[in-house]
């Protein structure tokens, strides 16, 4: 009987919620021949991930979990990134790659620069699952978009290695810098939350809410739905960390509200005509966006370069091959073409 081959590499997943488990299910595939270790403060989450086959072993201590790992993926909330980085920094082996998936990059890159030795490499990533969320057994990130964000002066080989995760997950890649990413998050993630908050406060703190709450229907409920299952400390930390970008986005939102108030100051017929035009334009634009969002990988899919498999990348990066800088340049060129 032939003995099983030694694992090509070791991967550690810190954070075993829905996304961390989905990443594990992709990386623990037998054909990749990787040893996947999981770590989560929630023992129940770790047990479920182990039982699902997303990880091969549970380690309660994050530092021990990272010892000897070639790749460490942080799938934890933004508020937990800094303490996790500080907790694992001394355990990381030379040339280990740490991929963090938080929704803000500038602060996480600063924390990594303070905590991690120079010969350990951090790369930012953010996964946008397609909508609607696929039903099992379809993987969560099938046809998703993996945004890759590189810190200044980052190692190009580590960046290429991170890019290899995308096809393993069934996702496509898109490259942006940290400032651009955080600015986009201010508009697409943080501004909607604050507008939901402002809508709720504008209505509930005005005279008449005592009676108004009885007649408020699904329109108001949907407009304030982002407040439903919110983790207030985590959300507040994100908003505060991105406050400069968010303040600019609020300024743009105020300009739009002022324009709407100007329209409402006209006569009834003119107001209705102008509002109808704006509503139709917004409805059509949103429809196009939702159609594209359902399959973000369709954009210029034929421009994605051929790159070695993740298994080959493990072998090449961690001792069995040479630098792959030409490959990552091709990946960057393809991503740049997507933006044009």
Stretches found by the model and what they are:
Residues 211-287:
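Interdomain hinge/lid region at the active-site interface
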Residues 112-185:
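Rossmann-fold dinucleotide-binding core
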Residues 89-111:
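ADP-ribose/adenylate-binding Rossmann-like module
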Residues 62-97, 147:
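Rossmann-like NAD(P)-binding element
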Residues 156-169, 180-207, 213-231, 247-255:
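Active-site-proximal catalytic alpha-helix in oxidoreductases
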Residues 33, 93-96, 118-120:
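A short helix->loop->beta-strand "cap" motif at the edges of active sites that frequently abuts
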């Amino acid at each position: 009987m032939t003995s099983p081959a030694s694992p090509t590499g070791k991967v550690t997943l810190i954070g075993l919620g829905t996304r961390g488990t989905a990443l594990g299910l992709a990386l623990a595939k037998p054909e990749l021949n990787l040893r996947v270790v999981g770590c989560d403060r929630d023992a129940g989450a770790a047990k479920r991930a182990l039982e699902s086959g997303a990880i091969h072993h549970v380690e309660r201590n994050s530092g021990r979990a990272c010892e000897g790992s070639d790749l460490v993926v942080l799938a934890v909330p933004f508020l937990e990134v800094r303490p996790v980085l500080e907790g694992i920094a001394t355990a990381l082996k030379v040339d280990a790659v740490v991929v963090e998936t938080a929704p803000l990059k500038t602060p996480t890159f600063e924390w990594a620069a303070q905590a991690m030795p120079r010969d350990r490499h951090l790369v930012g990533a953010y996964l946008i699952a397609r909508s609607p969320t696929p039903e099992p057994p379809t993987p969560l990130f099938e046809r998703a978009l993996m945004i890759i964000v590189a810190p200044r002066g980052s190692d190009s080989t580590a960046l290429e290695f991170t890019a290899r995760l995308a096809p393993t997950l069934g996702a496509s890649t898109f490259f942006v810098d940290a400032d651009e990413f955080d600015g986009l998050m201010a508009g697409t993630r943080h501004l909607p939350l604050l507008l939901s908050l402002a809508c709720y406060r504008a209505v509930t703190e005005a005279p008449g809410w005592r009676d108004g709450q009885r007649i408020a229907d699904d329109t108001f409920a949907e407009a304030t739905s982002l407040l439903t299952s919110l983790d207030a400390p985590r959300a507040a930390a994100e908003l505060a960390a991105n406050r400069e970008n968010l303040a600019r986005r609020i300024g743009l939102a105020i300009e739009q509200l002022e324009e709407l108030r100007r329209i409402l100051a006209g006569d009834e017929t003119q107001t209705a005509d102008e509002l109808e035009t704006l509503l139709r334009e917004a409805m059509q634009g949103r429809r196009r966006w939702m159609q594209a969002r359902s399959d973000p990988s369709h954009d210029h899919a034929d421009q994605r370069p051929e790159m070695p498999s993740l298994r080959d990348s493990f072998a090449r990066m961690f001792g069995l091959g040479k630098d792959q800088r030409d490959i990552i340049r091709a990946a960057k060129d393809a991503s740049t073409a997507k933006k044009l």
